[in-house]
Amino acid sequence: MRKHGWQLPYHPLQVVAVAVFLALGFAFYVFFAPFVGKKIHQYIAMGIYTPLITCVVGLYIWCAASDPADRGVFRSKKYLKIPENGKFPLAKDIKDGCGSATGGAKSHDGTCVEDTENGSNKKLESSERSSLLRLLCSPCALLCSCCSGKDESSEQMSEDGMFYCSLCEVEVFKYSKHCRVCDKCVDRFDHHCRWLNNCIGKRNYRKFFSLMVSAIFLLIMQWSTGIFVLVLCLLRRNQFNADIALKLGSSFSLIPFVIVVGVCTVLAMLATLPLAQLFFFHILLIKKGISTYDYIVALREQEQELEAGGGQQSPQMSMISSFTGLSSASSFNTFHRGAWCTPPRLFLEDQFDVVPPENASVSSYGKKSVVEERVKKKPQPVKISPWTLARLNAEEVSKAAAEARKKSKIIQPVARRENPFVGLEASSSFGSSGRRMFPTKYEGVNNNGKQRRQSKRIRLPAELPLEPLMNVQTKAAMETSTSSGLAPLQLEARSAFQTSRAMSGSGNVMVTSSPESSLDSHDIHPFRVSSEAEDAAQLNGFSSAVGLMGQQRGQQQQQQLSMMMMPLSRSTSDGYDASGGEDSDQVPSRNIHKSR
């Protein structure tokens, strides 16, 4: 679990950001400010630039050093580094390491003492570094504590109760989000900034926004001063040769000076563009009252809708396309026929491509493969675009974020986790109307609190012969001395929750299904009973009932043999599933429903 951005390992973008700002600051005081003209101009330039760079450095250090984690994370075992057994194995490891060898006891004891001394020295060095870092960040901390408002923890606790994070194993607030990079829950999570190597949440969002504004002004000051110096260098070339030799040394000529100033100016201009784009993006976020995480969730939801719709645009997409002024009949569409028309990538970096037509198959197997590809496909990273954000509806974005929180398997409401398995559930298996009074291991509770049943269904292949079934039924018929015209009954697993309707004394063999049955009506093909069998069953009702009860033993033995060749398929739906699969309308299915 990462506590702050200065914790090892550093991100490469963090190293780049620190190096660029240090290089720009050094270049301004050495190559920019001394060559702006008169002394008064130099003092003005340094007087403006110095507070800006001080503010940027201080805010950067403070934003990266702050811990935006949820309050509950501070009490977690991961944050406190407490093992699961609650015991610290430090002393035990030292003891085991010291007493592991018997032959060279003295040498091992010496190495153990050295290891403990090295560990204590490292701890002292780390404590000194942390105290030095706190001393450097104390002015920024004082400024930020004065500017920050009151705590809103009581307000969050009153909103829909508390939530539980299964990864942090603590209770968190409603709008907290678990960051996979930092491996902790962040209070009012906005995004994970790779340039800071830290998460941005409620605790450091204001500092992050202030850092953005200060950095933009600093970069504008940098490249505007650089352009001014380059113009003066072209106009006063002879004077600049003398000034360069006087202030930088005789070995430094005009050409290297122009190269250094030009490179730093271009670098500052290039850094200003994405930073200004990010600034306007967060201005729109604040205006709409949403976060960066909500924006990302909404765009991914739109991508899924486009893929599921087969190229049809959602209302929000159509509205965006109408604002951009590019229609589907434009010349851009000739190069991207299967894609939704978007502005150039300079203004809108995300393109919402639909599924290509060749990937979609008419057959049911093709549809299944396309769905599996969509499920297995990892979500693409969403790029920041103020143009897209300006055309999004804030209410729809909030709804998408709320649905994402409801579907989350990591952070769930406390009430949802403590919801017991109560209630009655009808069990339907060929006409049985029994009810289960206790939950099984195949039952669960979905997000809405309703019960859900996962049934196991056995499907007979079409090429399976009916001779074993006929032999079992013929043997049972010979034992009961009934008419030989009885057709073999459909084999069924004996369930403890079935009623005796199927084994009643009546001669008619009824096969019924309740609305909750996982077998569809068009897939059920029970064996018909002849008229002779019906008459014989009516005359010998009692004897047939006794015979059917005795028949169950033979059926169970035969079923155990046949189940070894039967492919199992589980239904994870809410009670309804296409039992025939892809070949349901080609081969008559003989299904055996087994419920637990």
From Swiss-Prot:
This enzyme's EC code(s): 2.3.1.225
Gene Ontology MF term list: protein-cysteine S-palmitoyltransferase activity
Provenance organism: Arabidopsis thaliana (Mouse-ear cress)
PANTHER family: PROTEIN S-ACYLTRANSFERASE 22-RELATED (PTHR22883:SF265), ZINC FINGER DHHC DOMAIN CONTAINING PROTEIN (PTHR22883)
Signal peptide segment: none
InterPro entries: Palmitoyltrfase_DHHC (IPR001594), PFA4/ZDH16/20/ERF2-like (IPR039859)
One Gene Ontology cellular component: plasma membrane
Main location: membrane
UniProt-annotated location(s): Cell membrane; Cytoplasmic vesicle membrane
Organism lineage string: Eukaryota, Viridiplantae, Streptophyta, Embryophyta, Tracheophyta
UniProt entry keywords in alphabetical sequence: Acyltransferase, Cell membrane, Cytoplasmic vesicle, Lipoprotein, Membrane, Palmitate, Transferase, Transmembrane, Transmembrane helix
Highest taxon in the source lineage: Eukaryota
Keyword Nucleotidyltransferase: no
Active site: residue positions: 193 (s-palmitoyl cysteine intermediate)
Transmembrane segments: 15-35, 44-64, 215-235, 254-274
Membrane topology note: Multi-pass membrane protein
Reaction catalysis annotation: L-cysteinyl-[protein] + hexadecanoyl-CoA = S-hexadecanoyl-L-cysteinyl-[protein] + CoA
Residue span(s) of domain DHHC: 163-213
UniProt-listed Pfam families: DHHC
Polar residues bias spans: 498-518
UniProt-annotated stretches for the region Disordered: 102-125, 433-455, 498-523, 549-596
Listed name of the protein: Probable protein S-acyltransferase 22
Group of enzyme by EC: transferase
Listed Low complexity bias regions: 549-571
